[in-house]
């Protein structure tokens, strides 16, 4: 079975619910997507697109609350000695639980002004606590190599930005490298995006397919447990949907 035939079969046979998309998947031997699947309508440099800061949220308040609640359930307890977290594709807000702190929380994004304003990267007067301890400005589509040592992080998060990665396997292999054995990677997404900058395989498919696409990144990157999908949509049909695909680095990787 060729790659396009496999994709057509799997997309038509999985449940209509994203949470079921990664159950009992028979992955082909080779990564089933082609280079053109990762092209975008707008191929101008991403640095230009993200040059001006956008101090807006990209999902609604209910979806944000659902994501924050999920984080509160799966993150290591606040102030756990030695814990490090990386928020990839970060901006001016990370949606971590209020007051959440760790010894090292790194934000990586495209716009420095947004990262500087992140309440996890700035000590606001009197009422807000430091959350981000450092930030890195990097275009993962140009430079997927992550500037961190092996086995550095306990958790990696990515909020509604996995759909912009044009070299996802390179990035996910790097995620595996920098995660500690047993470390958790959480990719969250909705049906909202900058359409012109999202990859074509994303804009031409639906939520269930998206769970399968992200799951394939974990699978073909290697070194991860079988990925799982979770639907945390707070008010189906009334607010933004919210989905999680997550996996842990194998303890032997």
PLM regions with names:
Residues 17-80:
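Class I SAM-dependent methyltransferase Rossmann-like catalytic core
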Residues 58-146:
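Class I SAM-dependent methyltransferase SAM/SAH-binding core
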Residues 66, 205-231, 243:
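Short alpha-helix
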Residues 142-150, 166, 177:
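Short conserved loop adjoining the S-adenosyl-L-methionine
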Residues 154-169:
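A short SAM/SAH-binding and catalytic strip from SAM-dependent methyltransferases
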Residues 169-184:
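A short glycine-rich, Lys/Arg-flanked "PGG" loop and its adjoining helix->strand segment in the class I
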Residues 184-216:
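Conserved class I S-adenosyl-L-methionine
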Residues 222-223, 231-253:
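Core SAM-dependent methyltransferase catalytic element
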């Amino acid at each position: 079975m060729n790659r396009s035939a496999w994709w057509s079969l799997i997309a038509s046979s999985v449940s209509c619910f994203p949470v079921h998309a990664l159950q009992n998947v028979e992955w082909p031997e080779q990564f089933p997507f082609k280079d053109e699947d990762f092209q975008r309508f707008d191929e101008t440099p991403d640095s230009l697109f993200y040059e001006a800061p956008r101090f807006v949220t990209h999902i609604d308040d209910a979806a944000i609350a659902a994501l924050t609640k999920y984080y509160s359930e799966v993150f290591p307890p606040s102030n756990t000695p030695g814990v490090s977290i990386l928020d990839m594709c970060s901006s001016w807000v990370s949606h971590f639980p209020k007051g959440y702190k760790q010894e090292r929380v790194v934000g990586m994004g495209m716009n420095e002004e947004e990262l500087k304003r992140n309440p996890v990267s700035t000590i606001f007067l009197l009422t807000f606590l430091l959350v981000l301890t450092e930030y890195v400005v990097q275009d993962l589509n140009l430079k997927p190599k992550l500037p961190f040592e092996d086995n550095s992080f306990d958790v990696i998060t990515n909020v509604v930005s996995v759909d912009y990665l044009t070299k996802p396997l390179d990035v996910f292999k790097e995620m595996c490298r920098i995660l500690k054995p047993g470390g958790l990677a959480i990719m969250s997404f909705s049906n909202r995006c900058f359409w012109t900058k999202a990859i074509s395989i994303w804009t031409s498919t639906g939520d269930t397919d998206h769970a399968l696409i992200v799951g394939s990144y974990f699978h073909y990157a290697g070194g991860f447990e079988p990925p799982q999908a979770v639907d945390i949509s707070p008010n189906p049909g009334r607010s933004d949907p919210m989905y999680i695909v997550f996996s842990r680095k194998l303890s032997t990787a």
